[in-house]
């Protein structure tokens, strides 16, 4: 018996023991993976696992962390009740989580096992423990632990996950964060308070796509842009209307700035509608003649005078001839060519909103009849085409009567970076109506002849081409071998081309799910065109400034997610609507978003106008418009005004989903402070990026 005890004593003293290596914290931003007791081992957690199962779990977790660019493993070394312990310390008498697997010569130690796996993978290890007592001596606890284990630190879980020594908190991506991946991005914007992120391993395995989006927020390779340097001022001032202004309505919305800490009076009556920063707006009655409005705050007063002229007297009763512009009537059968970059084909020439089709510069059609209509206070001609729709005469130029009909024998395909270009063999640039029907491209060409055996050669996208001659037009239907995302009929040098765009797909590159996706962002207005005036007036951000700030925020977040982002402007410059629309065709993006902020006539109460809306023209843009409204309103708490059809110039492209976002109202005082707030700009920018991600089909 004595010999046995001596042997055991010798074994304990002399048997080689694993010594902890120097435990160093990882360089750069902390990116950790946490193993917790909240899940069974099969799901990536610690509970219900014996030594062999836990060893496998630790090896898998280390490999997973290494593969996903993480630099640390976090292990829950005790559950909340101390009923399960994952390390050995003489302060605790039992280790219920591992005791069943102990033997005389072997004591399984989960923390040591994890440290060994982490060391091989080049990962740091941190222990996580419940906050058992506010007076706990964490320095002593960590020092005692580091005598036996290669741990870089001890983190304590209370209301947050924080370092036991420095008390610096890290972002813990738990179930709530995985269900709202924007949370980590917004937390990372706190330059001083953000020290890294730790991801729940079980959640990573269960929700890999959300993990990818969450992790993208840790990409700091690009410099974060400066947005708006604006704080609502406390100076009493009126931004609208100007002193001495003439107003022709019975009401006027008076806007300006004030000190939010002091009461504001307008002609002795308290002004209730103010933003947190003191920006105010109030609807006032305007009587005929001179109206004086005096704003008072503390010992300061500001007055503006508004004049409302009396209505002009009645006329002589005679008729006034409406002038005619310089367009001309043409004979039926005259060919005409579209002269502008895009033009509307109208059901009714009296209304610009009755659009049947948008056609591009160079399209040729035949006039069936002419009719007069009004535009801009002048009479003008409208040409009714063979299709039955009308084009306004100033959008078209007459051609010689002997202009030949278009004629085509086939088409040849050439691959591009984004799809293919089909060049028609033959001559002519006929007017075409296009539509996507059940994944096929249906094109109706007017005044054009097609060979019965018309086919597309050399295409990897086009599966078949069917020609169906009809009454006045020929229908060409293209089916495809894979989904086509967009198309454009282009005319150049007397030839007709169809540009086909391949469908983008979500990438499986970790942290970069938008790799390969191209987005074109258009910050509305610019330079001499300020857009809507803000409620704070001159010297404060105008719409053009807020549009650019939100565009830059969205660009930054989209690029974090892997997208290739182009912007129409990156400074205070101006581009025409045509230049903006041309950029869509030239760039062939997968998504186009025009970023704007709203306004309204200032004869109504702008305090009642609030929220986000988004416009699309073609059906392909509807889903993107809906996603933008949903996500921006959720991120900013602005009201949802819906996705709506509209014929804005920049949205009239079939290249890709194209929308115009009105993110919020510039003339609503409270919402003005909201849309110019940097945290809200980042939240809305992230919402734009998430909307794009939602609309990209899975790979």
Placement of each model-derived feature along the sequence:
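Active-site histidine-acidic residue metal-binding/catalytic motifs
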Residues: 85-96, 131, 500-583, 587-589, ...
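Structural recognition of the beta-strand scaffold that forms the well-ordered cores
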Residues: 32-34, 72-76, 126-128, 152-156, ...
């Amino acid at each position: 018996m004595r010999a046995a005890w001596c042997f055991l004593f010798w074994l304990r003293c002399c048997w080689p023991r694993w010594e902890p290596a120097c435990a160093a914290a990882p360089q750069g931003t902390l990116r950790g993976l946490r193993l917790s007791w909240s899940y069974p081992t099969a799901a990536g957690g610690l509970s219900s696992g014996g030594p062999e199962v836990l060893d496998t779990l630790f090896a898998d977790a280390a490999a997973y962390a290494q593969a996903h660019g993480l630099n640390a493993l976090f292990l829950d070394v005790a559950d909340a009740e101390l009923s399960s312990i994952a390390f050995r310390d003489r302060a605790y008498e039992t280790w219920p989580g591992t005791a069943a697997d102990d033997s005389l010569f072997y004591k399984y130690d989960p923390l040591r096992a994890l440290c060994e796996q982490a060391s091989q993978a080049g990962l740091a290890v941190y222990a996580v423990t419940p906050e058992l007592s506010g007076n706990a001596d964490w320095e002593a606890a960590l020092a005692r632990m580091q005598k036996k284990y290669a741990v870089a630190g001890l983190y304590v879980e209370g209301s947050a996950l924080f370092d036991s020594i420095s008390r610096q908190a890290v972002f813990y991506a738990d179930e709530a964060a995985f269900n709202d991946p924007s949370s980590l991005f917004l937390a990372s914007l706190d330059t001083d308070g953000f020290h890294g992120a730790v991801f729940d391993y079980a959640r990573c395995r269960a929700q890999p796509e959300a993990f990818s989006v969450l992790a993208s927020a840790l990409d700091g390779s690009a410099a974060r842009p400066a947005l708006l340097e604006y704080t609502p001022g406390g100076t009493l001032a009126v931004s609208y209307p100007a002193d001495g202004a003439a107003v022709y309505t019975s009401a006027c919305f008076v806007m300006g700035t004030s000190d939010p800490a002091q009461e504001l009076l307008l002609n002795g009556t308290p002004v209730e509608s103010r933003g947190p920063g003191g920006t105010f707006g109030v609807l006032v009655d305007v009587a005929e003649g001179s109206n004086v409005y005096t704003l008072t705050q503390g010992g300061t007063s500001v007055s503006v005078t508004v004049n409302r002229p009396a209505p002009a007297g009645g006329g002589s009763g005679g008729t006034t001839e409406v002038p005619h512009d310089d367009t001309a009537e043409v004979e039926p059968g005259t060919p005409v060519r579209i002269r502008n970059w895009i033009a509307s084909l109208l059901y009714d020439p009296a209304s610009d909103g009755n659009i049947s089709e948008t056609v591009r510069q160079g399209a040729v059609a035949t006039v069936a009849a002419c009719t007069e209509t009004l535009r801009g206070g002048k009479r003008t001609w409208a040409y009714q085409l063979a299709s039955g729709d009308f084009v306004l005469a100033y959008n078209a130029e007459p051609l010689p009567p002997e202009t030949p009909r278009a004629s085509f024998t086939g088409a040849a395909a050439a691959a591009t970076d984004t799809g293919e270009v089909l060049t028609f063999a033959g001559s002519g640039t006929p007017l075409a109506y296009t539509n996507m029907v059940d994944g096929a491209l249906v094109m109706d060409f007017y005044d054009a002849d097609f060979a019965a055996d018309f086919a597309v050669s050399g295409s990897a996208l086009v599966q078949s081409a069917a020609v169906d001659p009809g009454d006045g037009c020929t229908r060409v239907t293209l089916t495809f071998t894979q989904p086509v995302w967009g198309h454009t009929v282009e005319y150049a040098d007397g030839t007709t081309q169809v540009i086909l765009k391949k469908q983008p797909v979500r990438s499986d590159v970790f942290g970069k799910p938008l790799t390969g996706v191209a987005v074109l962002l258009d910050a509305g207005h610019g330079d001499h065109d300020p857009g809507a005036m803000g409620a704070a007036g001159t010297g404060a951000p105008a719409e053009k400034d807020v549009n650019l700030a939100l565009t830059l925020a969205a660009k930054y977040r989209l690029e974090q997610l892997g997208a290739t982002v182009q912007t129409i402007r990156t400074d205070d410059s101006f581009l025409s609507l045509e230049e903006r629309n041309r950029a869509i065709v030239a760039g062939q993006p997968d998504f186009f978003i025009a970023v704007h902020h709203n306004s309204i006539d200032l004869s109504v109460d702008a305090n009642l106008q609030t929220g986000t809306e988004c416009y699309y023209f073609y059906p392909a843009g509807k889903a993107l418009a809906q996603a933008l409204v949903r996500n921006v309103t959720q991120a900013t708490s602005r009201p949802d005004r819906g996705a709506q059809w509209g014929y804005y110039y920049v949205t009239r492209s079939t290249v890709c989903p194209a929308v115009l976002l009105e993110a919020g109202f510039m003339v609503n005082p409270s919402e003005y402070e909201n849309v110019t707030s940097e945290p809200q700009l980042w939240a809305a920018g992230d919402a734009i990026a998430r909307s794009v991600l939602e609309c990209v089909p899975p790979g």
